[in-house]
Design a protein with these regions (language model features):
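Glycine-enriched, solvent-exposed interface loops adjoining structured elements
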Residues: 1-96, 108-316
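Short alpha-helix capping/helix-loop boundary micro-motifs
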Residues: 99-105
Length: 316
């Protein structure tokens, strides 16, 4: 038996729209939907995809994020130093206040315009941008440091355009990681009332409680106690939002198993516009739900799979 050896089947925004309209009988074989019809269907397709976030959509939308140390504040927006990737190094020689050229252990992967955070001797974090990287062991920053920075103090950097997080839909599995010792301790994720009931939210120490507010635009993390220096980073797992269908050739932000559910679901939503009867539309909704359930069943749930031997006695 000959098979293709190929696994890269995909579809696109406009192909899904055309297939949905064909499924409805709104267009015939070989016909092209009108531009206005495509625009309206694309809008509904985006709404449908966004609504799927209610299922949590595990696995492919599950990512790891990091809150870099920030000081003198109890909360941080996801538009700030909350990232999916970062690098760290240390100051390699004592630096005086007002310096812009800093000696670091390794600046190899730094680049101009990257965000950089330097731990000051008073425990605060000084965030600015990188102006240039003269060599592999120094960096020039845009805003001079406002305190002394001793050798061994931590330095964090990341590329804002690539590494800043998209607003998480859900956040869970939080740990406080010591950047130097590379050890982690669990953080208790609390609700809104539990966090705001805390008496002294300006106290500093090892963060052990976090409340995440997924407000519109950018989410906000509230931490307790506040970071006391730059030694630790908060790690967490999160479900990111689904990507939009912006252009005709945009592919779905989901595995292949969900393509059919997406197409039939769009057909069900568009049904009334094209004169589909209530009974037929109900059938489309049933089909769409069935295909989506089957697709979800094919995706492993979050968590671990444990394998163990069968120790039952076997007769030869």
């Amino acid at each position: 038996m000959a098979t293709s050896g190929s696994y890269d089947f995909s579809t696109s925004r406009d192909t899904i729209i055309k297939d949905a309209l064909l499924y409805l009988g709104a267009i015939g074989e070989g016909e092209t939907p009108a531009a206005d019809a495509v625009t309206e269907a694309a809008r509904m397709l985006n709404m449908l995809m966004k609504s799927w976030a209610g299922d949590g959509m595990p696995i492919w939308s599950l990512k790891r994020g990091y809150i870099l140390p920030f000081t003198e504040a109890s909360s941080i927006s996801t538009s700030s130093h909350v990232v999916t990737n970062y690098d760290s190094t240390t100051i390699s020689a004592d630096e005086a206040s007002s310096q812009t050229t800093l000696s670091v252990t390794d600046s190899t992967d730094m680049a101009a315009s990257d965000q950089i955070g330097i731990e000051m001797d008073d425990g605060t974090m000084h965030y600015t941008t990188i102006s240039s990287v003269p060599d592999g062991t120094s960096v020039i920053v845009a805003t001079a440091i406002d305190d002394e920075a001793s050798s061994g103090n931590l330095v964090y950097w990341y590329t804002a355009s690539a590494d800043r997080i998209q607003r998480p839909i859900r956040v869970f599995d939080m740990q406080l990681k010591n950047e130097t010792a590379v050890t982690s301790n669990p953080i208790n994720q609390v609700g809104r009332q539990e966090y705001f009931d805390l008496s002294d939210k300006t106290s500093e120490g090892s963060t052990n409680q976090v409340y995440y507010d997924p407000e519109l635009g950018n989410g906000t993390f509230h931490v307790f106690p506040r970071f006391q220096n730059g030694d630790t980073v908060i790690e967490f797992s999160f479900h990111r939002p689904f990507q939009d269908f912006d252009a005709a050739g945009d592919e779905p932000d989901c595995p292949q198993e969900f393509y059919l559910a997406l197409t039939v679901g769009l057909a069900a939503i568009l049904g009334p516009k094209y004169g589909v009867s209530l009974k037929e539309r109900q059938q489309l909704l049933i089909e769409s739900k069935m295909y989506k359930t089957e697709a979800l069943d094919s995706i492993y749930p979050e968590g671990s799979v444990f394998l163990q031997p069968d120790n039952a006695r076997r007769e030869d």
